[in-house]
Amino acid sequence: VYSYTINKQKREKPMAHDLEIQNGKTSFASFREPAWHGLGTVFTEEKTTAEMLEAANLSNWNVRLEDMPIPTHLTSDKEYQYVVRTNPTDATQTDVLGIVGERYHTMQNEDLFSFGDNILDGGGRWETAGSIKGGRVVFGALALERETVLDPSGVADKVKTYLLINTSHDGSIAIQASITPVRVVCANTLNLALGSIKKKNGVKQSFKIRHTQTAKGKVEIARQTLGLANLYMDEFDLMAKAMFEKEVNAKTFNDIILAAYPKPEKDTKGAIKKWETKVDTINDLYTGEFNGMIAGTGWGALNALTERLDWARTARGGKQESLLAAASGFDAQINAEKNRLAKIVKTVLAIA
């Protein structure tokens, strides 16, 4: 006989970061620096994959399937199952993470993270890991050796390269890897779909990871992943350098804002006031603490626009949302908006 707890995190008040909190423990771990939300485990020594899973409350979930009985008054030609796990903070509790069809196969967090060992052998290290949405989505970020420095003898604006992996335990998303450049000074994610400046075809920024149990297969996936990361960052470097070298005066920056967010024609439901607040926020970010040194460039314009999306916006529709997902780079809607903004900046500044 099984008794299930639908995992909706009722014990703790939901917060905008959307991290999973169970029995007072937050499923998140971060290297050296406390995260902006101030939660989880901070560690100062590099960790193995097993140690990272333990620090982030991601180990020994025993994700599995249980039959979902169909009520006697209903009929169905399909079978459905619960995806369940052992609660990471209370082994006596079993949580339902989702309902899936008969073809669904579970994956343990240990399997998702295991290919990271081969990235570690290539000079990477674990940076963050955690779970959100009540354990339905898990993620980890590996810091890679590759980094970009714009104007090294001047402002020396540094961008580090991370590989983000994430998947779901409710069937909503596959195993996904994303190459995520992060501007160091403000932790602004710049995971953009890049159309090559020199080539017609762009390079991959995100891709699905094939699940394999063999050691040889995992080594091959790691090799391909690092190769894709370097190809992507080659293109990113070209784009960032081209933007940094483009001068942007006050009028041009205003043109960029208007192209991105045209002023409403009608003041419906306070639309003009909301637009003015958005424009003021972007201007403040453009000349503020983190972007002031690159203001007057296309690079500064792009970062002001994308920083607002990561850190300075309000919840859509007044609902709680995962700012962590957006700022970490796996909110698809935010990523699409960043790509739209990057395209606008390039168009206004005539960058190929």
Predicted regions and their residues:
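Short beta-strand element of the conserved SAM-dependent methyltransferase core
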Residues: 83-85, 140-145, 178-181
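Beta-rich nucleic-acid/ligand-interaction surfaces
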Residues: 128-148
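A generic structural signal for beta-strand entry/edge sites
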Residues: 11-14, 80, 137-139
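Intrinsic-disorder-associated, low-complexity terminal segments enriched in Asp/Asn/His/Tyr and depleted
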Residues: 2-7
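A short, surface-exposed helix-loop junction/capping segment
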Residues: 75-103
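Amphipathic alpha-helical segments
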Residues: 102-126
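An N-terminal amphipathic alpha-helical segment
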Residues: 63-81
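Intrinsically disordered, low-complexity regions enriched in serine/threonine
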Residues: 10-68, 130, 146-352
